């Protein structure tokens, strides 16, 4: 049914359907600086190039946890610069948003009601709202997000349970991949793909140099002072080499994916 409803815009990429209409003039992609969002942006740029589409790519990045992890802005800029340098045929625009640490899920939890009537955290509402604003301002046809599925063969504490849902071709799960909001689409094409598939794409497309630019670690001096040794917004400089903790969910997920065939 998924193929029936969106068949005219589906492109098979390493066994996974990626919705993209070559007639679209403006697309938005959330890019954090991590491996998942960087690969999604890469795949979309690849489709634009292969189909000679006249599509502007709007990269949306959020400054988050700026006091604890000030390097995250540099991570997203590094990915953006890589994309611009490698896809010189494409017009890019970057849009940067700021999210107060006080609104993050880790600070307050899910305490607010979003526009769809769901209980959500402030950061999620802010991300959705900013994407909607940019989509309207830039007349975007679709906005993409690279949220992926939890590892199926790795037990990790603090996993996000909403990433465990299984695709069953119901309307509910199809809507988690792509759905229409008014005149525009919202799309999570990696929603049911694990990070091992995403890492395999880096190998398949010979884009390991892009993977090297990305950062998955969500650790910082508060949680792992033995690793970060006091590093925060007061001492961080953009030319610093920032360590990875190797212990957080995101580090362990990435390490697991890199060892998968």
Predicted regions and their residues:
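Nucleotide-activated chemistry modules centered on ATP-dependent adenylation/adenylyltransferase
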Residues: 2-261
